[in-house]
From Swiss-Prot:
The keyword NADP does not apply. Binds 1 Mg(2+) ion per subunit. It comes from the Bacteria. This is 1-deoxy-D-xylulose-5-phosphate synthase. It comes from Escherichia coli O127:H6 (strain E2348/69 / EPEC).
Length: 620
């Protein structure tokens, strides 16, 4: 989309943060209004993360106005809220390409702009990185400032508190801004509290506090009295005791939509020494009423008509794999009151909304705490219950030691329902489910299943749920099922594949939902097609049978080739000294960028055309 200067006259003056800082303060509320309208206009045309960015407009303007970015270093946690940041930092005219193949990255990305200090996508990393950046800046000695912006969801993760605990110990000069976007402004936010925040962050208060500490430091009773007096004054109106105990100077909460007030407070805090903590209250979806009323639905949006206030309804076609899982979960829970379901803040994405309503006493959203989710499941299993951890492939990486140490070594019957396995599309490198087969396959006695359609997905979930000799995992992709008939649930024989088609010379061993594409290739090349079903344990007898009766084998998976299912097939053949040639088709050895799933599969040669071309070139 072309930028309409007449529609956004103030925003048109800002092609960089240097130009932003030349604007008079009085024009900034108008700039915020235009920035918010431009965000609505652009995202509604292109799709993308939406409600979070609407809530951080004033904060973004204030931070870039007060701090000398990019010299001063601004870090955004996760990055859903960073669209206004991208618009103000030279990427305004490209914002319509965000999350598209070859377009702007969905999150702050170091390779895209010097303003993006840290590449992000997973939550709760900003403070840890910020401490390192602040320590490096201190050693550099150029008075470079460091600011981290973290949301109220991301700050619940243990990593954020580990970082704050460390910051309180080594006391780097840095600012952490907590963007608290609950549904309404806290009743503490008002004229008195904003005035107090500016007073407590001001130089007079700071110098009096530090001077008083020095004067009375040798008189323990007076020193303790001063400390307690300060805490009591702040404690009457601020909820920052926890952050103060961690060693931060806490200011807030303040109105995160008062851009001029934010600028005053940030200017006061900019030169304070040691770790500083600013708590701001914002409203997710601010300025667009439908998003304010339903920020979860408007968190990430497809293209939509902003005048209608409604997102396009689903065409009502095939169900998603997430829904297939959610329906199976409810069906199983109705028959077995031992079932317990756990998610790390992914209720909607994992298809668990209905379950959470029907079985609230057996539904546990542990927030952004993947490590805790897995070990909590271990505890439930020890207690005689049947835990299911519903988690995205990319987020299970964060709990790898817990899978190993707390579940697998103890052979606990925990079922991992791994959503978003394989290529996920528009969220790019940080969210592709490229590695789960590789990092799970090496865990002793782990059962790993790869369904080829929604019916197999249900059967495998059922099989894993009733497997009591250790952990099991079922991995399935983002997107819709293929439309096969659902049959009554029954346990599958562990470690057994099935031959779907008999051909000649070439056998294709398929792992997972690339099966429809593999079937087209098998038909075209008159190849045998095998649905392997299990990555662990592998059906060694079937692999050896295929090796004995065919001239070559091809493995197909939507996982990294390195260490994946195909690697397992190679290991079986080598262990049995079978000299049959094998072509492994899967995800290559690089981080896969954003694009639609169809675009990226075509580019990587994972559609039928690409697979057939790879096989023919290999056989030539």
């Amino acid at each position: 989309m072309s930028f309409d200067i007449a529609k956004y006259p103030t925003l048109a003056l800002v092609d960089s943060t240097q130009e932003l800082r030349l604007l008079p303060k009085e024009s900034l509320p108008k700039l915020c209004d235009e920035l918010r309208r431009y965000l609505l206009d652009s995202v509604s045309r292109s799709s993308g993360h939406f409600a979070s960015g609407l809530g951080t407009v004033e904060l973004t303007v204030a931070l870039h106005y007060v701090y000398n970015t990019p010299f001063d270093q601004l870090i955004w946690d996760v990055g859903h809220q960073a669209y206004p940041h991208k618009i103000l930092t030279g990427r305004r005219d490209k914002i319509g390409t965000i999350r598209q193949k070859g377009g702007l990255h969905p999150f702050p990305w170091r390779g895209e702009s010097e303003y993006d200090v840290l590449s992000v996508g997973h939550s709760s990393t900003s403070i840890s990185a910020g401490i390192g950046i602040a320590v490096a800046a201190e050693k550099e000695g150029k008075n470079r400032r460091t600011v981290c912006v973290i949301g109220d969801g991301a700050i619940t993760a243990g990593m954020a508190f580990e970082a704050m605990n460390h910051a309180g110990d080594i006391r780097p000069d840095m600012l952490v801004v907590l963007n608290d976007n609950e549904m309404s402004i806290s009743e503490n936010v008002g004229a008195l509290n904003n005035h107090l925040a500016q007073l407590l962050s001001g130089k007079l208060y700071s110098s009096l506090r530090e001077g008083g500490k020095k004067v009375f430091s040798g008189v323990p009773p007076i020193k303790e009295l001063l400390k307690r007096t300060e805490e009591h004054i702040k404690g009457m109106v601020v909820p920052g005791t926890l952050f103060e105990e961690l060693g931060f100077n806490y200011i807030g909460p303040v109105d995160g939509h008062d851009v001029l007030g934010l600028i005053t407070t940030l200017k006061n805090m900019r030169d304070l020494k040691g770790p500083q903590f600013l708590h701001i209250m914002t409203k997710k979806g601010r300025g667009y009423e439908p998003a304010e009323k339903d920020p979860i639905t408007f968190h990430a949006v497809p293209k939509f008509d902003p005048s209608s206030g409604c997102l396009p309804k689903s065409s009502g076609g095939l169900p998603s794999y997430s829904k297939i899982f959610g329906d199976w979960l409810c069906e199983t829970a109705a028959k077995d009151n031992k079932l317990m379901a756990i998610t790390p803040a992914m209720r909607e994405g994992s298809g668990m909304v209905e379950f959470s309503r029907k079985f609230p006493d057996r539904y546990f959203d542990v927030a952004i705490a993947e490590q805790h989710a897995v070990t909590f499941a271990a505890g439930l299993a020890i207690g005689g219950y049947k835990p299911i951890v519903a988690i995205y492939s990319t987020f299970l990486q964060r709990a790898y030691d817990q899978v190993l140490h707390d579940v697998a070594i103890q052979k606990l019957p925990v079922l991992f329902a791994i959503d978003r396995a394989g290529i996920v599309g528009a969220d790019g490198q940080t969210h592709q489910g490229a590695f789960d087969l590789s990092y799970l396959r090496c865990i002793p006695e782990m059962v790993i299943m790869t369904p080829s359609d929604e019916n197999e997905c249900r059967q495998m979930l059922y099989t894993g749920y009733h497997y009591n000799d250790g952990p099991s995992a079922v991995r399935y992709p983002r997107g819709n099922a293929v439309g096969v008939e659902l049959t009554p649930l029954e346990k599958l024989p562990i470690g057994k594949g099935i031959v779907k088609r008999r051909g000649e010379k070439l056998a294709i061993l398929n792992f997972g939902t690339l099966m429809p594409e593999a079937a087209k290739v098998a038909e075209s090349l008159n190849a045998t097609l095998v649905d392997m079903r299990f990555v662990k344990p592998l059906d060694e007898a079937l692999i050896l049978e295929m090796a004995a009766s065919h001239e070559a084998l091809v493995t197909v998976e939507e996982n990294a080739i390195m260490g994946g299912a195909g690697s397992g097939v190679n290991e079986v053949l080598m262990a049995h000294r079978k000299p049959v040639p094998v072509l492994n088709i899967g995800l290559l050895d690089f981080f896969i960028p954003q694009g639609t799933q169809e675009e990226m599969r075509a580019e990587l040669g994972l559609d039928a055309t690409g697979m057939e071309a790879k096989i023919k070139a290999w056989l030539a």
